[in-house]
Amino acid sequence: MLKITIIAACAENLCIGAGNAMPWHIPEDFAFFKVYTLGKPVIMGRKTWESLPVKPLPGRRNIVISRQADYCAAGAETVASLEVALALCAGAEEAVIMGGAQIYGQAMPLATDLRITEVDLSVEGDAFFPEIDRTHWREAERTERRVSSKGVAYTFVHYLGK
């Protein structure tokens, strides 16, 4: 069975983005993301794809979901739905959902794992992570609170579906 992991960094108010960008810069979180996703298929929405500084993400199968039938994401596979994206990952052990807000909302009922970076900020934004329903998720691991090289405090949390 395909393991479906959602990976996200969320502020205290569950904000994940503002103006199609992350409202913070945590190099250590980017490093964790890279190590965790290398060699795995990553699934993202069109806006997340367009926000990437480097496209496609190297060392990963990039799958972009877009409702625009003629959308072309050079270096990635473009599909019309999350279901089609997951079907493309059938031969993999794990697929990683990396955003944005709409894709996270669609993926939550299907996910087996959540890899959440809790960012100790409350920021203004226009994209938010769905509420984590504790009746469906249990905390499996939590790192000690750390402060990034940019001065932002964060914690890595791993949730497993119940």
UniProtKB/Swiss-Prot annotation:
Enzyme class: oxidoreductase
GO molecular function list: dihydrofolate reductase activity; NADP binding
Stated family: Belongs to the dihydrofolate reductase family.
Signal peptide: none
Gene: folA
Keyword entries, A-Z: Antibiotic resistance, NADP, One-carbon metabolism, Oxidoreductase, Trimethoprim resistance
Enzyme Commission number(s): 1.5.1.3
GO cellular component term, pick one: cytosol
Binding site for substrate: 7-9, 29, 60, 117
Record-given protein name: Dihydrofolate reductase
Catalytic activity: (6S)-5,6,7,8-tetrahydrofolate + NADP(+) = 7,8-dihydrofolate + NADPH + H(+)
Misc. remarks from the entry: Strain T47/F62 is trimethoprim resistant by overproduction of DHFR.
One record GO biological process: tetrahydrofolate biosynthetic process
Domain DHFR, residue spans: 3-161
Taxonomic superkingdom: Bacteria
InterPro entries: DHFR, DHFR-like_dom_sf, DHFR_CS, DHFR_dom
Pathway assigned in UniProt: Cofactor biosynthesis; tetrahydrofolate biosynthesis; 5,6,7,8-tetrahydrofolate from 7,8-dihydrofolate: step 1/1
Gene3D superfamilies assigned to the protein according to its UniProt record, in alphabetical order: Dihydrofolate Reductase, subunit A
Binding-site list for NADP(+): 8-9, 16-21, 45-48, 65-68, 98-103
Biological role stated in the UniProt entry: Key enzyme in folate metabolism. Catalyzes an essential reaction for de novo glycine and purine synthesis, and for DNA precursor synthesis.
